[in-house]
Amino acid sequence: MLVSYNWVKEFFQDFPLTAEELGEAITRTGIEIEGVEELSASLKNVVVGEVLSCERHPDAEKLNKCLVQTDETEPVQIICGAPNVAAGQKVIVAKVGARLPGGLKIKRAKLRGEVSEGMICSLAELGFESKVVPKAYAEGIYVLPAHVETGVSAITLLGLDDAILDMAITPNRADALSMNGVAHEVGAIIHQKPAQPTEPDVSEKGKADDFISVEVENPAETPYYAIKMVENIEIKESPLWLQTKLMKAGIRPHNNVVDVTNYINLLYGQPLHSFDYDKIGSKKIVVRSAKEQEEITTLDGEKRTLQAGHTVITNGVEPIAIAGVMGGEFSEVTENTTTVALEGAIFSSSSIGKASRELYLRTEASIRYDKGSDAWKVEKALAHGGALIAELSGGTLVGGVVEVDNREKAVNKIETSLTRINRILGTAITLAEIETIFDRLGFVLEVKNDALIIEVPTRRWDITIEADILEEVARIYGYDEIPVTLPATSTTGGLSDSQKARRVMRAYLEGAGLNQALTYSLTSKKDATRLALSDEKTVALSMPMSEEHSHLRTSIVPQLIRSASYNIARKNMDVALYEMGTVFYATEGDNLPIEQEHLAGLITGNWHTIDWQKTPKPVDFFVLKGIVEGLVNKLGIKSELHWKQTEKEELHPGRTASLILEGQEIGYLGALHPAVEANYDLKETYVFEINVAALLDATKEKVVYHPIPRYPEMTRDLALLVDKNTDHATISQVIQEHGGKLLVDIELFDIFEGESIGENKKSLAYTLTFLDSERTLVEEDVQKATNKVIEALQEKLHAIIR
């Protein structure tokens, strides 16, 4: 948020800090200031001038020869190329010797033979970004109001004798997304109470009920909705003070109605929206959920398709605004507007955030609703906005508001103690200091024996538990004032067995070709239950930052799927990821959730083997199966890993297996269901997820080291035809049992099914590797072992050797 230093000072009678000092003080209390920009640092000798005459340059069609009065001396001639310059205008003039942003220094010059003694400036030439310059002046100079005195400093007039603090507001401090909120924060720092904003004293006439009525269909999504009416208005430019406040905050001025809604949003952090009353087409506003595929053209001219669940403002028939996000073009305020219906509302932060993300439409209003707002300041903001519109437009403020109020006000009281504060913070704060701290914060403190009971104002809705109170004490007391203490004991370094095992797993998976991923533990309600190993209940956050991060995950795989989709959308087509992280399951009552460590992986695209001579091949079930089996072997687990075909929602019904270790199901491995792959624009994709605790707790074999073989190995390829229902594990077991001590490795390299070999048959091809560590093998040794394997396969599995 861009904060004007001069605007902050307006809240206080005596302000003791410079802009730089204020930035440092705010940063020390927990809100980072990313930068402080002095707007006038590169400006000098810029004044208000009056264009006395304006005529075309004799030798340049696009240039104008202007006679400009800048002070009490003789007027000067200035050559200007702006298309909107005209006689009688009050303009911004950089005199000879002036300095402008970018190091530009104004000198007396000749342009096409005519002398130019200065420069008539646009706002962009004074340092304003083009996106905040009013559209009427986007292609030319800025024209000042006619009443402005000639010769005065344009730097002061435009509020450029100011500094802008760029505040990085964290999600929990949305109260600071307003000047009023910033003023409270600054007041706590400088030991002063900020003045509260006051609306203009405007008389009211008539009743708002005579103009419109309001109906809210879902009070949970819209706890409060109100309309304030202003009639007989004249749409025109806002006064200079309002335009400059908006531009310095990064907002483009439009007109005296829209600018007031943006100003109130900045001042209170409460979004308002203005409807052209005559365009609504009804005397009734209905707030409801959008219908699936319902459409609205928003103020930016885009036609948007809504989803069920988006909250919309309607005239009883069709949407006129997307609640909390953006108004509709249908009811836009224009230069012909004479009556305004001004909306002030409280919407569900989760629903507004969800709509904003799904529509890819992020606005100043949606940002504030998404992060949360003070539900009890909306009436004051609406009253201020209505009165200011009436004052600036010469309109009539209609009496009363039309409202639907379903808010429930609860006093937020939190209890702690002085002893607990000092013990946790490591301080020796006195009760008197605590009382001063809470007074500076504007919190009400009640002392009962040893207990401190703090009543938190509604503007600080982020404070809900004792830890929040302790943080506030630490912030205002000063983090740099908290004594540094050393640990009471020392510990010896070293890794536990489980830490060593985790390092082995990571090293093995990375060596196998997978890249480590780190994804959020927070996910949406929908994703929280997908592809979980357990059917336990999910854990919901009490104060989620957004709907997309409202639950703790029960599986890592959904986040890996999103990561793969993100990579493929950016043309990284071959993705191999793994993550070792925590999943969470709910427990009964208010007990802490169960935390389990899981290992998950994903491969999609082509698989690149280590051998440079082999070409990449599409991923398949057996690539990932081999990696998982290799991981189990690497950990030295004594028991064999068994595979059992299974079915799991969102996985392919014919390519999914559960992993069985020591008689316990510890995970799953399978291909994503084609519908899931299509939803994320993925090609064939395989995933696995394993309970890490089961791997760590499994019985391990003793590590035995063998010398590197001195003698060469020999291989034999074996292709066999077996019944379609015979699985690879059974075949591998028979080969292992009858291959003898010389057989050191079995690799399946081909599977074939088709009409040419029979309907209920399949062909599997294996490479058998033989090795003797004591001598060089001869053909007779290998053939003898191979024959035993063939005989066993024929006898036990009725295999046909091809």
UniProtKB/Swiss-Prot annotation:
Major site of localization recorded for this protein: cytoplasm
Q: Which cofactor does it need?
A: Mg(2+)
- Show where the B5 domain sits: 409-484
Which GO MF terms are attached to this record?
A: ATP binding; catalytic activity, acting on a protein; magnesium ion binding; phenylalanine-tRNA ligase activity; transferase activity; tRNA binding
**The EC number(s) this enzyme carries:** 6.1.1.20
* GO cellular component assignments: phenylalanine-tRNA ligase complex
Top-level EC class, please? ligase
* Domain FDX-ACB span(s) in chain numbering: 709-802
- Chain ranges of the tRNA-binding domain: 40-155
Q: Which GO terms describe its biological process?
A: phenylalanyl-tRNA aminoacylation
Q: How does it assemble?
A: Tetramer of two alpha and two beta subunits.
Q: What is this protein identified as? A: Phenylalanine--tRNA ligase beta subunit
The species is Listeria monocytogenes serotype 4b (strain F2365)
